[in-house]
Amino acid sequence: MTDLEFMDHAEKLLLAVERSCDRINETTDADLDSQRSGGMLTLVFPNRSQIVINLQKPLHEVWMAARSGGYHYRFDGHAWQDSKGAGEFFACLGRDATVQSGRPLQFAA
């Protein structure tokens, strides 16, 4: 994958997370805050815990840091998969956001 292809896929991922946060806030009282700064997106929960998602352009990876740990995702042509087998990005984000918020939250591409 070229740098340009990576950035295209990675930007789509960040935009999808931002849109999911907007949808969650419109349909629930989760009060999720998303803050974007370049290639980094920080999700802040009412209990002040955070999930940080950032782009690692040289490695063609998207990294996610949550209370449960750190994860590295690579695009396999269809989805972003964890490099150590933890699963697909949006499923993992939903799992960690649910734990950190104390309520069921779903994210989608």
UniProtKB/Swiss-Prot annotation:
Gene3D superfamilies linked to this entry: Frataxin/CyaY (3.30.920.10)
GO BP term, pick one: iron-sulfur cluster assembly
InterPro entries: CyaY, Frataxin/CyaY, Frataxin/CyaY_sf, Frataxin_CS
Domain of life: Bacteria
GO terms, molecular function: ferric iron binding
GO cellular component annotations of the record: cytoplasm
Pfam families hit by this protein: Frataxin_Cyay
Residues spanning the membrane: none
Keyword check for Metal-binding: yes
Matches recorded under SUPFAM superfamilies: Frataxin/Nqo15-like
UniProt key word Cell inner membrane: no
Keywords from the named record: Iron, Metal-binding
Family in the record: Belongs to the frataxin family.
Function description: Involved in iron-sulfur (Fe-S) cluster assembly. May act as a regulator of Fe-S biogenesis.
Designated name of the protein: Iron-sulfur cluster assembly protein CyaY
